[in-house]
Amino acid sequence: MRKKNLIFFGLLFFGLAANAQNKILDPVDYVNPLMGTQSVHSLSNGNTYPAIARPWGMNFWTPQTGEMGDGWIYTYTAEKIRGFKQTHQPSPWMNDYGQFSIMPVTGKLVFTEQERASWFSHKAEIVKPYYYSVYLADYDVTTEITTTERAAHFQITFPENEQSSIVIDAFDKGSYIKIIPSENKIIGYTTRNSEGVPDNFKNYFVLLFDKPFATNYTWHDKILEKNKLELTNDHVGAVVGF
């Protein structure tokens, strides 16, 4: 996987270099989505997060440094990323709804938001309105995200190792997860919200992978269950290995 990624980016670089003299910068490349992210509850200024999305897109995606339920999803001074989160949050004071997260890990299997968090550096982070990339130092993993009108494409580059996994966190206050190994698919829903939604509110999601699952786990709270493919509880998630 890593070799293929290096070849792809090498060809891309060659193409850009060959056309450098005719390059026209798209206005969107002037946008810095990190502006306003150096804010916390005690000093509420900016109050933004790096939203990766299409204009008028159904869903936004963002790296998550704050804990689940923290309106300050991403804080510039934070040192660790806990996941990559689907979000609809308009303001930290209003908080979020329709939210879940994805996080790659390697080595020892960890899945809670405290254990799975990885150190990162802004020097190894690329942030555009249409693209996000970051190197997760604890796992030697690079995560890339770009979006469509209603979905997102992830490319995750793992190192060569015995255990590479992806953690899906459907968050608390009522959630559901199901792994479908025969289709390389995970489905589920999350109900976590901050009021102002119908009583039967659910945010459904479907995750499709381009590689088969070598291992399957579901989890609730801090309990991990191997080969149990479906789970409903207050706070559930899944872990699939490759």
What is each residue range found by the language model?
Residues 21-242:
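Accessory carbohydrate-recognition regions in carbohydrate-active enzymes
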Residues 1-22:
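Bacterial Sec-dependent N-terminal signal peptides
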